[in-house]
Amino acid sequence: KINILDAPGLFDYVGGVHEAITAADSAVIVASGKSGISVGAIKAYDLACELNKAKMLIISKVDSKSADFYKVLNQAKEILGPSVTPVIVPFKDGDSIGFINVLTKQAYITKDGVSVKASIPDSENDRINEMFNALCENIAETDEENKEDFKWYYENKDNYIKERLRYEYLDNNR
């Protein structure tokens, strides 16, 4: 069973955000792909850190012509710290927008209202590989038992990363 507590990110409602994050096991913080990281998002992130809650940042409105996913991602890294690492990233294919799963290195695009597998654009390959390596390193940093054993980690990383990400976000009752 999953319960979702929706709290507005406006600074005026910080009390409601505090109550929601306190009651929840984890926090999903939304930032606009058009306007970036808001003060409310920063406050929510800081509170989730203070309360030792798992955090997920979603960059919305990436389908807007004026959105800049990577600008907002870099802003998030500067403000919230280097552990901000994307798992899903958008890409443009003509007038369509697709998404790349950094973990599985699989791209999807919506055609006629249905998501279908697509090829990762050549222009995105290096960036996706860099993000995959950063994601692996950040996930490995959460594992006190194995983080120093890089040989073990690289031999087991395909399954380990998925399992560790699930554990950190869903199973780790802090």
Residues covered by each model-derived region:
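Inter-motif core of Ras-like GTPase G domains
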Residues: V14-S35, D46-L47
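Loop/turn-to-beta-strand initiation segments
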Residues: K1-N3, D25-S26, A54
